């Protein structure tokens, strides 16, 4: 595959945009421009049976309605339903960057053992939404805790064959409201699959902060559970290492001890 977009125009669905949204935000989705090599799969969480029109005039769009809530559940449906060779996860307020997507697809084609790519996102002003590494990195349990779903592109069949799914006990809409992306990457790596970070911009997303995950006891409890899920019996020591980094940034001793105890 070359960088020329026309090389993708083969009639095969190469890329799936896997959107996850709530019913009340369904009509707010920023849809990518129609292309012959892509499909747009929209998973709508509609537990209250909100009356919405799920029909689309575009042939490249498919909509799946869920009568349940939870972003991890909707991502798993997207994995099971995707027709593309690759899939990038999407939220309703994301705008994708064509050049970055093509570069990621080229990387997948050149590296057939790569199962997941983690890229970058920028805000509406073009500024990086977080601190990103400047060079390519192989992902591990130790460097992927800050991954975001909309930064992730997967090789669909490899993920399905390995039986990797998002843990539905974590993520927005679940009691443990964060960490689903980190757990997904960790499970992938534990199974011996390859995941790479690339310093390429995949999408634009508004610079909306969900708050400091060290702020409340609930935040600390959930974050502790994430590390327990990823590291098992070694989570206690990982939490100590994290606290050592966070105390100089303002984490109180009492909250540090609460987090360490899990």
Language model regions located:
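N-proximal low-complexity "stem/linker" segments adjacent to membrane-targeting elements
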Residues: 1-39, 52
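The conserved acidic donor/metal-binding loop of glycosyltransferases
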Residues: 91-95
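A short, conserved alpha-helix in the catalytic core of glycosyltransferases
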Residues: 152, 158-159, 169-198
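Active-site donor/metal-binding and catalytic loop motifs
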Residues: 172-176, 194-214, 223-226
């Amino acid at each position: 595959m070359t960088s020329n977009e026309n090389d993708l125009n083969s009639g095969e669905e190469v890329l799936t945009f896997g959107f996850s949204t709530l019913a009340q935000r369904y009509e707010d989705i920023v849809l990518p421009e129609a292309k012959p090599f892509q499909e747009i799969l929209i998973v709508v969480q509609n537990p209250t049976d909100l009356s919405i029109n799920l029909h689309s005039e575009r042939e490249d769009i498919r909509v799946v309605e869920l009568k349940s809530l939870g972003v991890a559940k909707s991502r798993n449906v997207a994995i099971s339903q995707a027709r593309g060779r690759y899939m990038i996860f999407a939220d309703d307020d994301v705008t994708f960057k064509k050049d970055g997507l093509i570069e990621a697809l080229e990387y997948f084609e050149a590296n057939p053992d790569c199962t997941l790519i983690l890229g970058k996102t920028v805000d509406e002003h073009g500024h990086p939404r977080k601190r990103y590494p400047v060079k390519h990195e192989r992902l591990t349990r130790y460097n992927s805790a800050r991954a975001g779903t909309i930064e992730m592109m997967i090789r669909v069949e490899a993920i399905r064959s390995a039986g990797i799914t998002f843990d539905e006990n974590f993520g927005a809409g679940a009691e443990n409201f964060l960490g689903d992306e980190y757990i997904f990457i960790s499970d992938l790596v534990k199974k011996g699959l390859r995941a790479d970070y690339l310093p390429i911009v995949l999408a634009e997303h508004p610079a909306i902060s969900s708050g400091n995950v060290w702020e409340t006891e609930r935040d600390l409890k959930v974050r502790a559970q994430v590390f327990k899920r990823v590291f098992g019996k070694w989570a206690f020591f990982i939490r100590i290492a994290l606290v050592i980094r966070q105390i100089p940034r303002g984490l109180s001793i009492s909250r540090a001890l609460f987090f360490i105890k899990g």
